[in-house]
Amino acid sequence: MYTAMQMNFHRKLPIPQEVKKEYPLTESMKQVKAERDESIKAVFDGSSDKFILVIGPCSADHSEPVLEYISRLKKLEEKVSDKIVIIPRIYTNKPRTTGQGYKGMLHQPDPDAKPDMYKGIVAIRELHLAALRDYGFSCADEMLYPENYRYLSDLLSYVAVGARSVENQQHRLTASGIEVPVGMKNPTGGDLGVMINSIVAAQSSHTFIYRGWEVTTEGNPYSHAILRGYIDYAGRNVSNYHYEDLLRVEELYEKSNLTNPSVIVDTNHNNSGKQYLEQIRIAKDIVYSRNQNKDIKRLVKGLMIESYLEDGAQGVHEHVFGKSITDPCLGWEKTEQLILDIADKL
C-alpha cells in the first residue's frame, strides 16, 4: 500500500478481460443473451409492441434472495411473455445522496463486513452469471462507475444512468459505446432538457479516454429517457409520469430529431415520493395513459418497478430474507398481481 493525494492505494484490481476469462459465459449463454438483446431492442425500435418491465430489488444485497426472486419472475414470465418482456433488476452499485451508507454488492459483497472491491467484482459477476445460466435472464444494472461497466458488459441487456450521473460527460460518452439500450434518467432537479441532451450525447459518436485507452464509439441508437420524478427548489417531491408530462417529453423528442424516441417510467423514487405502495397505482395510471393516446403508447415502452420478496425495507443488519436494505420495495404477492394486471390491460 502507498499513499498519494490523500488516497491509500491498497492493491491493483484485475481488469475486466481477466475477470471475464476466469468467469466466462458458455456458448449457450451467449446465444440466450443475444436473443434477449434483440427482443428488447425490438421494443425500443418499434418492431415489437411488447411492454418492458425493468423490475427487481432497489439493490442486490445478497445472492440467495435475489436468485429466489428471479426464479419466481421466471415462472411468472411464462404467463405474460406474449405481452411483456421482463428484465430483472440486479443493481450492484448504489448511488448515495450524501455518499454515506451501503453502496451495493460491488463495494460490500457481505453487507455486514468491510468493503472488499475484489470480492465484490467476483460476486456481482457470479450473480449475473447465475441469473443467465439458471433462469435465462440477462438483466439490468446501473452504470454508477463507467470504468467498471466492462466487468458485466457481456451479461447486461439493459443499463441505466442515474439522476446524479446523467450530466456527467464520462457517463454520456461511455453510454454511446454500449451495445444494449441505455436509459438516461432525468436529473434530480427535473430539467428535461438536461435529460434530452444526455440522450443526444449517448446517440452520437465520440473519441475519448476509457480505462487507459483512446476509444471511438459509434453512438447508441437505443439510448432513451427514464422519468423518475424530481425534487423542486423547495425540496418537495414532484412527479413527472402524468399524461401531460408524457406529452411534453414527446414534444421534446420531436424537436430533437433523436432515433427511437422512447420513455421508461420509474414508478418509485420521486414519482412515488418514495411511498413504495404508490407504485401500483402509478403503473396502472401509465398503462391507462398509453391506452388513451396513440402517441403516448408509441413513446412509453415500459416501466421500472422496485420490488423484492418482502414489502418495505429494513436496516442493513436486520437480516430478513428478501427485504430491501435500501429503498422500500413491493413484496412478491403485490408484484405478481401487478404484473398480471398490467398484462391484462395492455
Annotate each PLM feature.
Residues 1-45:
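N- or domain-start disorder-to-order transition segments that initiate the globular core
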Residues 2-3, 11, 70, 83-248, ...:
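Active-site-facing alpha/beta catalytic cores
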Residues 27-43, 76-87, 93, 117, ...:
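N-terminal beta-rich core of secreted/periplasmic extracellular enzymes
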Residues 44-47, 74-81, 129-134, 217, ...:
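Acidic (Asp/Glu)-rich catalytic clusters
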Residues 52-65, 327:
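Conserved phosphate/anionic-ligand binding catalytic regions in large, soluble enzymes, centered on
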Residues 56, 265, 331:
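Conserved, mostly hydrophobic/aromatic
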Residues 58-61, 260, 268-274:
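Short acidic, Gly/Ser-rich segments with clustered Asp/Glu that frequently serve as metal-coordination loops
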Residues 308-346:
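Internal helix-turn-beta structural module
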